[in-house]
């Protein structure tokens, strides 16, 4: 039954959002996201377009004996602090139900705030990791280094690495709690005291990467998948080889896997998109 629902939902998304309302769509299992771009002065028109689209989807689902769950429907504005200050639309009405536009939403376990600083998500992530480390500390004396390292990788490192590519471009102040988690986990594995230096141990003994290199590694993996067509289309479209551009003269650099970079923009949100971030990955990394 869930498979049938997904097929019908995918057909509905393709029929209405793309053709009639020009809304972008991201869908994972039964979790669907609609997004679109607009200026702050046009927020009322944008809300009307989204509401009309959802109303048509609801009518189609009702005719096919499905139900749209308005209780789980959430809305959020994304932008800079200056842009958000110009937005005066804070509610949306669906089928007579007024839904407040939130300042934070959760998508696949990641808390997204309006300015995409991910401060709330990092705070929640670090709290859960420290809780797991406290639990492991209580049984540390009964474990050897290998077993402790395995448990840390399972309960802590897996949380740190989950969706960490979204932290690219986030300020060092927000990433500091994650690095603290890595440091505490390393001290637990090698049984060092709280204020002992741990940087060289992380690098030489445990072979762990610091948080900023973990982010760079994840971006390189995404770019590699995009170039080999094993990533979603909305990501692959952001990564193009210089040699694939039509009408461009072919040089020897075509074989060097240089990627097309868009025009530099000083907006912080734009600089964090994959089209700009893949410039941090050298062609030597991508060939590995």
Regions found by a protein language model. Give the residues of each.
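Hydrophobic/basic alpha-helical segments
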Residues: 1-288
């Amino acid at each position: 039954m869930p498979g049938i629902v997904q097929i019908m939902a995918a057909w509905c998304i393709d029929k209405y959002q793309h053709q009639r309302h020009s809304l972008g769509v991201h869908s994972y299992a039964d979790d669907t996201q609609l997004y679109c771009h607009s200026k702050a002065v046009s927020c009322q028109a944008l809300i009307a377009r989204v509401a009309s689209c959802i109303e048509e989807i609801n009518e189609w689902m009702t005719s096919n004996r499905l139900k749209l769950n308005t209780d789980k429907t959430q809305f959020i504005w994304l932008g800079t602090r200056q842009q958000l200050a110009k937005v005066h639309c804070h509610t949306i009405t669906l089928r007579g139900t007024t839904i407040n536009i939130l300042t934070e939403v959760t998508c696949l376990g990641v808390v997204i705030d309006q300015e995409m600083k991910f401060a709330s998500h990092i705070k929640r992530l670090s709290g859960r990791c420290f809780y797991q480390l406290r639990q492991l500390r209580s049984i540390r004396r009964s474990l050897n280094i290998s077993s402790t390292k395995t448990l840390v990788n399972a309960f802590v490192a897996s949380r740190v690495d989950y969706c960490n590519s979204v932290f690219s471009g986030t300020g060092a102040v927000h990433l500091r709690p994650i690095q603290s988690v890595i440091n505490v986990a390393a001290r637990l594995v090698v049984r060092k005291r709280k204020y002992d230096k741990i940087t060289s141990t992380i690098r030489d003994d445990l072979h762990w990467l610091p948080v900023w290199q973990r982010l760079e590694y994840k971006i390189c993996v995404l770019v590699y998948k995009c170039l080999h067509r094993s990533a979603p289309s909305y990501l692959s479209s952001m990564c193009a080889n210089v040699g694939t551009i039509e009408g461009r003269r072919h040089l020897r650099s075509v074989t060097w896997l240089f990627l097309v970079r868009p025009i530099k923009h000083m907006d912080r949100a734009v600089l964090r998109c994959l089209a700009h971030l893949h410039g941090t990955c050298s062609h030597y990394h991508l060939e590995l």
